[in-house]
Structure formats: C-alpha cells, structure tokens
Amino acid sequence: PNYDETDWLVTSIHEYAFELYTDTGNNLIDTKQRFQPLGLVFGSGDSITFESTHHTDRPPSGEKIWGIPLEKGKYEWWNHSLSFESSGKRKISVSLETERGEMYESPASRYGGGLKLKLWKKFLFGFDYSVSTIDWENAPQTKLKVITGKATINFSPDLFISNLIQYDNDSDSVG
C-alpha cells in the first residue's frame, strides 16, 4: 500500500514467492518459499526489508557443497534476513544485509554490504562484499568471502552495457 498522508513513508511491500526446481525427468529437486512480511520505502528513497526464506533440497548421493559431501536425502531449512538500502538517486548509496539461519540443516550466517557510486548520470560503479559462514555438523567450518565489482553505462532507459567481475576465496579465482 501507498501512504499519501505521510511524508516519511511512501509505501510498504508485503510479498510471497514460491519456486519449484525439477530435473529433466520432471522430478522435484528443491523448492524455495520467500516470505517478506515487511518492506518499507521511506520518503528519502531509503528502504528496509525483513524476509524469511524456506528451502528444501533433495541432493543425489555424493553431491558436494563447497567440498563438503552431503548424504542423500531431503534437507529443509530456514533463513531470515534484514537489509537496508539507501536511495539510488544519491551520488553515493550503500546497502547492508545480515542473514541468519541454516544451510543443509547446519547453522549459517551471512553478512554483506555494498557501495555504489554514480560518477555521472550515465555511469554507475559499485562493489559488494559478503562473508558467509556455515558451521557444518560433520565437517570443518566453511567461510566464503566474495567481492564483486560492477560497472554500468546507460545509453537510454532501454539500452545499457554492464560488466561484472567477482572473486571468491573458495575457488581463489576471478571470474
């Protein structure tokens, strides 16, 4: 809904999304449900969002996640996140996010942040950094650090060129 009677609050967003993933034989592999009970967009253009995500996965025997072998079976877990994003209309905008929950039924957390610079009207440069930690029950802790850089040139609202570069400590490579 929109809030025309207030200057400080423009709109609130309440969403639900559901995704199904199947293999080529149309067998269910995993599902994802996203609940966003609260998203607020303020008069300044800044926004804050809380959401919960429910995951299920049925990995085949021997599948590995970041080098950790998973037992065949059905996995189910929840994640909860709180995020803030400053208005993209500013020359400099920031984003922050924290997420807690599980991954493959092991405790997990994620912290991230980003910075975007609007160098001039047609050129945007930004980078994001995140740290994800999983405390596996049967393996050493995984700590994944990812840094991403992105540059975008806008020629018109319908035409732009964007380039992304990313590094993560798991693969120890740039891609």
Task: Label each residue range with its predicted role.
Residues P1-G175:
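Exposed, low-structure sequence patches enriched in small/polar residues
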